Amino acid sequence: MSGEEEVDYTTLPLEERLTYKLWKARLEAYKELNQLFRNSVGDISRDDNIQIYWRDPTLFAQYITDSNVVAQEQAIVALNSLIDAFASSSLKNAHNITLISTWTPLLVEKGLTSSRATTKTQSMSCILSLCGLDTSITQSVELVIPFFEKKLPKLIAAAANCVYELMAAFGLTNVNVQTFLPELLKHVPQLAGHGDRNVRSQTMNLIVEIYKVTGNNSDLLEEILFKKLKPIQVKDLHKLFAKVGDEPSSSKMLFEWEKRELEKKRSQEEEARKRKSILSNDEGEYQIDKDGDTLMGMETDMPPSKQQSGVQIDTFSMLPEETILDKLPKDFQERITSSKWKDRVEALEEFWDSVLSQTKKLKSTSQNYSNLLGIYGHIIQKDANIQAVALAAQSVELICDKLKTPGFSKDYVSLVFTPLLDRTKEKKPSVIEAIRKALLTICKYYDPLASSGRNEDMLKDILEHMKHKTPQIRMECTQLFNASMKEEKDGYSTLQRYLKDEVVPIVIQIVNDTQPAIRTIGFESFAILIKIFGMNTFVKTLEHLDNLKRKKIEETVKTLPNFSIASGSTHSTIETNKQTGPMENKFLLKKSSVLPSKRVASSPLRNDNKSKVNPIGSVASASKPSMVAANNKSRVLLTSKSLATPKNVVANSTDKNEKLIEEYKYRLQKLQNDEMIWTKERQSLLEKMNNTENYKIEMIKENEMLREQLKEAQSKLNEKNIQLRSKEIDVNKLSDRVLSLENELRNMEIELDRNKKRNDTNLQSMGTISSYSIPSSTVSSNYGVKSLSSALPFKEEEDVRRKEDVNYERRSSESIGDLPHRVNSLNIRPYRKNGTGVSSVSDDLDIDFNDSFASEESYKRAAAVTSTLKARIEKMKAKSRREGTTRT
């Protein structure tokens, strides 16, 4: 064995053993660290040897990724002990964020995927403890989500299980669900369709946990997730949801900041309990809150509010915005205004089927729907085709519901609300149902009875149509009015202002209508008013109705639920008075004044001369100490609001003071309402200004971008024009060249024809001369191509022939431009030699033209030259065409 292997690693210091090459040495070092952390829980702030592992997360980042699985397991156990030791004293700061971002991904990748059960359990415990140092699970989940894109199924399943455990342990406390859930659910369909069964199983568990922590909100999952899953998976999820029940998920763990707040709250409550227990004779029997109210057996150590109910999520705000104005069908404007009803209906159906029905949320910013809603309003009000009216009403309802407020502005309401009221005259069920839904949807977002009074114009339109001459319109508008009163949750101050002069007279007309169906709706309307304002308000009005109608109204009143303003308790009446106008205050004060008077009159000690009223309002007698003790005991059972001094109330209960108080309350309430209205208007104006400025900036940027694009397009166009001109010049040159070549060819052909004719003429003339003896001066040695002098001597004639042959050979290699000259220079010289080898003139004169050998040879030679010329001309043409094609 070598010297290095014989070293006893147990003698090495801890720092060296933590990085020693033998895994057993590292294992023992990790165990020693774990024991050190456990023994130093109460004194970790003073021990620098422990602080270094907390301050430098890279140390344990190396330990928990140990190559040996046994040593790695012990390193993760030591890390868990380290986190437990520092968790209680660790405050929320950037260092905690560094620890989480450094250790969590390593624990997921190396710990949760381990084959050892203890390693996986301890890794999950470390991840949860690290998340407890944060304020929410957002960062931890964001660190785990990238593992969903990995290829290893074991790692993907571990990541899905990690997110599930985080949500089950901490819930959605301090989580911005509007951004958190869409980012998480974006990866779920891919995981649900994974090829590995374990991944799919963990994904289903994660979906069920999301359902639980969102307060059993299945609508959220249906809108965002279910359409991306397989039908069988959706069916299985519904079965799992049914097993969960109606109880929302409760968190198992608390963040460290929650633990500190809960401990602080408990200590404060304990101090308050000790400080205020002296108010009771039986010390410690009752608990009193900070307002002095008695706590009747309430638990002070209640869990956080997050464990009491699920998170309320606005599903609509999480949906992606879509645009529809850029998806209008082709020629929509022309087709929708066509005189043919089929064209109008087809345009509406095409837009509804392809765009509107598929839309989940409409974009409101930088989109103007006035033109589209104006078209729908015109169709609803004027179109004779009820199918087009129904489609337009459905479209209006969907646009209103997908824009909501403030996207569906009051300007849009004015375009469609009155046309819808006018068209309630339709009796076909499908049409009138579409109109009803559209009206109810608009009133859902713009309540005609809102206490702010901004929608009083809508209330006036409804009341005006309740007096319409058409019975169907009266009935439908009365039903809409009843629905608005039933759904009102903001008080009835607006209805109170219109009650005496407009609402009651119109309702009386409806009650006295000639048609039974309309009267029944009128009875319901009157009954709702009685439920809201009380029977005493309408005593005189009911006297003008016959007994049968009064009976019908009373029966209807019994079937209706109670409304907030009609509540009989003094507390609810006082709370309602804070939100109502002066007329409501008078009415409610008159009703609520009965209760105190009865309590005073029913007291058995009222007529006792020895009795007296104590400052807290309870009646006591000096001769009955037991009664005094009972009253002293009952003091703590009264709330602080009931401890007002009745002497002041009785002394200031004159009619004059009541009127002044009511007047002051009315003025104060009016000023408060005006202030609220002005504040809202100011905010809306500021928002509009900001939106206008933003829109202006966007338009300026877009304008600059378009200008740059225009400049680029112009420069490209100029370049293309220059290239086009150059191409045109090249084409013109090539065309001219082709024309010149064609002319040359044509001239050559003409010259060849001439030469041929000349040869034929010479042959004929020589045939005539053959029978005669011709003088040498008149004999031509050329057969039609070129004439020679008859007086040439033999030597000169031979020299001329030699020169002409040389010239012919030289010219045969010249360019095609010399073709006419070369054709003219062609010579045919047939001659015969005598015995001495010299041709004489007499021999030429004695030519036997019956022997056609010489003429045939000359003709063949001319034909060969002609064919050669034609072949060269064709090659020249082909070459010119190729050059023209290449240039183009």
From Swiss-Prot:
Protein's UniProt keywords contain Phosphoprotein: yes
GO molecular function: microtubule binding; microtubule plus end polymerase; microtubule plus-end binding
UniProt keyword annotations, A-Z: Centromere, Chromosome, Coiled coil, Cytoplasm, Cytoskeleton, Kinetochore, Microtubule, Phosphoprotein, Repeat
Gene3D superfamilies tied to this protein: Leucine-rich Repeat Variant
Localization of this protein: Cytoplasm, Cytoskeleton, Microtubule organizing center, Spindle pole body; Cytoplasm, Cytoskeleton, Spindle; Chromosome, Centromere, Kinetochore
Composition bias, Low complexity: 765-780
Pfam families to which the protein is assigned, alphabetical: Stu2_CTS, XMAP215_CLASP_TOG
Single biological process term from Gene Ontology: microtubule nucleation
Annotated region (TOG 1), positions in chain: 8-280, 326-550
Quaternary structure (record): Binds to microtubules. Homodimer; each monomer can bind via its TOG domains to two alpha/beta-tubulin heterodimers. Interacts with SPC72. Associates with the NDC80 complex.
Free-text note regarding domains: The coiled coil domain mediates homodimerization.
Other remarks on this protein: Mutations in STU2 suppress a cold-sensitive mutation in TUB2.
Name this polypeptide is given: Protein STU2
Natural source organism: Saccharomyces cerevisiae (strain ATCC 204508 / S288c) (Baker's yeast)
Gene name of the record: STU2
